[in-house]
Amino acid sequence: MLQYNYDNLQRSLVDVIKEEQAKLGYYREDIRLYYPLSSLNHFFGTNVGADEMQRILDGTGEQDHTPIAAAMNEALSDKLGMVEVSHRGDRFCFHIPPEGVEYVHENTTENEFIRELVQLVAKHGCTIEEVYQLFTKHSGHVRREPMENGELDVRIWFEDDAEDPYYYCFKQEEEHMIYHRFLPADYEDFEF
């Protein structure tokens, strides 16, 4: 029987919900989070197409995926409720019910760094140097690299931080700062 570890998926879902709550505030409502197929393949160590991934997540298909789907729902439902998954092409939607959003709000610690980052980049005139200073305030092990792809200006990340493994990519647009964060494997897929 195939065995998958849902910890990375669950952690990613919780991290995105926390980030959304830092940006918009907490509301007890449904949330739909979208992931490309490549991210799911990274989470599960697979290399399957969209339809097979849907079968894996549903517990149907050529192989007996029923235990896999049951394991996913068991792993996620105690915290996030009954997560529904659908896809259109290579884009997967994870529908988190209100009780899952409430669980994250009530039972996880606020990510202070994300809250401060969201507040900082919302400030008119925020600079890359201010962003870098925020990173160094939270850790002495920070890396920064320029990006020369025309889409983003700089990538900053915490080195060897299991709690925050993301690459944060920033773009200065006049007086505004935008950012995207990626898990390292997803970042590599984008070939920045």
Named regions from a protein language model:
Residues 16-23, 59, 63, 75-78, ...:
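Surface-exposed polar/charged interaction patches
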Residues 67-109, 150, 154, 158-161, ...:
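Charged low-complexity interaction tracts in eukaryotic proteins
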Residues 109-192:
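Residues within mature, well-folded domains
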Residues 2-33, 43:
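Positively charged, polyanion-binding regions of nucleic-acid-associated proteins
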